[in-house]
Amino acid sequence: MAAGGGGGGGGSSSGRTPTWKERENNKKRERRRRAITAKIYSGLRAQGNYKLPKHCDNNEVLKALCLEAGWIVEDDGTTYRKGFKPPASDISGTPTNFSTNSSIQPSPQSSAFPSPAPSYHGSPVSSSFPSPSRYDGNPSSYLLLPFLHNIASSIPANLPPLRISNSAPVTPPLSSPTSRGSKRKLTSEQLPNGGSLHVLRHPLFAISAPSSPTRRAGHQTPPTIPECDESEEDSIEDSGRWINFQSTAPTSPTFNLVQQTSMAIDMKRSDWGMSGMNGRGAEFEFENGTVKPWEGEMIHEVGVEDLELTLGGTKARC
């Protein structure tokens, strides 16, 4: 009846009254559990020499088993090995310490602590220098890399903030991928005088005298020197073309004085050279191809004149 009442009370507390079948099952389950417990107790009394009371609970059985295994179980439930009695503070917090050491402490060591290390501390190592937009004036952030703190302290405070532009430089160096890409894109349309390749045979013309708009039959844009143009596409194309012409020229101006006959013939064939010769007159021509060593002086004068015209100066001749 007690078991049935207990089952009914449990059902009423949950909001539903157990049925008659459920109450019978609960009674059978409780009788089976008590029968098994009685057999265990009788076996321990008969064969294990355990001093168990007639009506005992499971705590008495656990205490007896601990005593047989060499443990000490006090009246308040404190359990420890013989000869290893812990202090009173540890005894009072023993259940809490066991649960903390087994469940709470290993989880921060395995999950919480290693995760900031690769994400926060690894970022200054992967990038050699901190980003200007993420500059932190707090010296504690540079403890791992002291030289970064020294660099930051050496920068004057009155300087304006660093501005990073995505525009390409006006005249990129020869090692720049922009100049290398512009060299590959050089076509016949980009060359002066309708795509004539004879201009590449005169390195001094390419360096000192870009073609003048007044001395050409076509209307193409001359490969002038880029003058700090802010536009990205024009500056990249002109600077690449200028570097392409400049790379074909030798380092010494006397290289043009050595090649006498071939240079005169090429000047006759190229429109650019012809326009320069017609502008200066026939005073430098000798017997249709016989070139004297001072031919280079004439070429240099033509180059200087065209360079001044390109930059917007007046037409002055030496």
Curated annotation (Swiss-Prot):
Output the PTM entry: Phosphorylated. Phosphorylation increases protein degradation.
Top-level taxon of origin? Eukaryota
Q: Quote one Gene Ontology molecular function term.
A: DNA binding
Consequence of substituting P222L: In BEH2m; increased stability of the protein and constitutive brassinosteroids response
Query: Residues annotated as region Required for DNA-binding?
Result: 16-97
Q: Does the keyword Isomerase apply?
A: no
Query: Could you tell me the keywords of this UniProt record?
Result: DNA-binding, Phosphoprotein, Transcription, Transcription regulation
Q: Where is the composition biased (Gly residues)?
A: 1-13
Which regions are flagged for Low complexity bias? 102-133
Q: Does the keyword 4Fe-4S apply?
A: no
Query: Would you kindly state one Gene Ontology biological process term found in this protein's UniProt entry?
Result: brassinosteroid mediated signaling pathway
What single Pfam family name could you report for this chain, choosing any that match?
Answer: BES1_N
Family (UniProt): Belongs to the BZR/LAT61 family.
Cross-referenced PANTHER family, in alphabetical order? BES1/BZR1 HOMOLOG PROTEIN 3-RELATED, BES1_BZR1 HOMOLOG PROTEIN 2
What name has this protein been given in UniProt? BES1/BZR1 homolog protein 2
User: What species is this protein from?
Assistant: Arabidopsis thaliana (Mouse-ear cress)
